[in-house]
UniProtKB/Swiss-Prot annotation:
This is Ribonuclease PH. It comes from Geobacter metallireducens (strain ATCC 53774 / DSM 7210 / GS-15). Gene3D superfamilies: GHMP Kinase, N-terminal domain. Phosphorolytic 3'-5' exoribonuclease that plays an important role in tRNA 3'-end maturation. Removes nucleotide residues following the 3'-CCA terminus of tRNAs; can also add nucleotides to the ends of RNA molecules by using nucleoside diphosphates as substrates, but this may not be physiologically important. Probably plays a role in initiation of 16S rRNA degradation (leading to ribosome degradation) during starvation. InterPro entries: ExoRNase_PH_dom1, ExoRNase_PH_dom2, ExoRNase_PH_dom2_sf, PNPase/RNase_PH_dom_sf, Ribosomal_Su5_D2-typ_SF, RNase_PH, RNase_PH_bac-type, RNase_PH_CS.
């Protein structure tokens, strides 16, 4: 039994609230336990210079954390004058994950800009961001279809993400901050609903991990992500 009462293979309480911000084409509040992220999807009728005239669209992402989303205040990256390496890595991961399930040709020469803003962090902010951003993206693209801008929804399949780690020798799904801080191994899995991987990130903090342990973490992640797909579908059906 974990500190929050969960079993080793259990997700935290997951909630996805759609239409959370009225101005964005797509906007959700996604909650993985005490981790809360606002994800918005904004449509622009233009593409980056490297795509102009090529008849294809683009999906990209930005990620940030509210200064007091963590236990102690962190200054805004804008105030420091540059984006940190962690932020750059996470927003590239979010963008890659969403492009993997978007038909960019069907999207046409327009862009969808995803903004993921962490308002409370308790571990797993990048995985929550990907899971919530997918729902915001679908809502934004549905709106384009309803307006007659697009003939079909340019979504090929769903995408979601979850963390898995080894804490005190045990494989745990969807780590909170305390567990993540104590983890001997930390992995993030991003998968599509056809059971294909977009990205797998894994790091041993102390002892290297075995193939058997990695396989165990993969199995736990796949089971967890399948549950996330069900939660996404339920949210989109409301």
């Amino acid at each position: 039994m974990r500190s929050d009462g969960r079993e080793a293979g259990s997700l935290r309480g997951i909630n996805i609230t759609r239409h959370y911000i009225k101005h964005a084409e797509g906007a959700v509040l996604v909650e993985f336990g005490d981790t809360k992220v606002i994800c918005t999807a904004s449509v622009e009728e233009s593409v980056p210079p490297f795509l102009r005239g090529k008849g294809t669209g683009w999906v990209t992402a930005e990620y940030s954390m509210l200064p007091r989303s963590t236990h102690t205040r962190s200054s805004r990256e804008a105030a420091r004058g540059k984006i940190g390496g962690r932020t750059h890595e996470i927003q590239r991961l979010i963008g890659r994950s969403l492009r993997a399930v978007t038909d960019l040709t069907l999207l046409g020469e327009r862009s969808v800009l995803i903004d993921c803003d962490v308002i409370q962090a308790d571990g797993g902010t990048r995985t929550a961001s990907i899971t919530g951003a997918y729902v915001a993206l679908v809502d934004a693209l549905h709106l384009l279809v309803e307006r007659g801008v697009l003939p079909l929804l340019p979504i090929k399949e769903a995408v979601a993400a979850v963390s898995v780690g080894i804490v005190d020798g045990n494989i745990l799904l969807d780590l909170n901050y305390v567990e993540d801080s104590a983890a001997e191994v930390d992995m993030n899995f991003v998968m599509t609903s056809s059971d294909r991987f977009v990205e797998v990130q894994g790091t041993a903090e102390s002892e290297p991990f075995t193939v058997e342990q990695m396989d165990g973490m993969r199995v736990a992640a796949v089971e967890g992500i399948r549950k996330l797909f069900s939660i996404q579908n339920e949210a989109l059906s409301r």
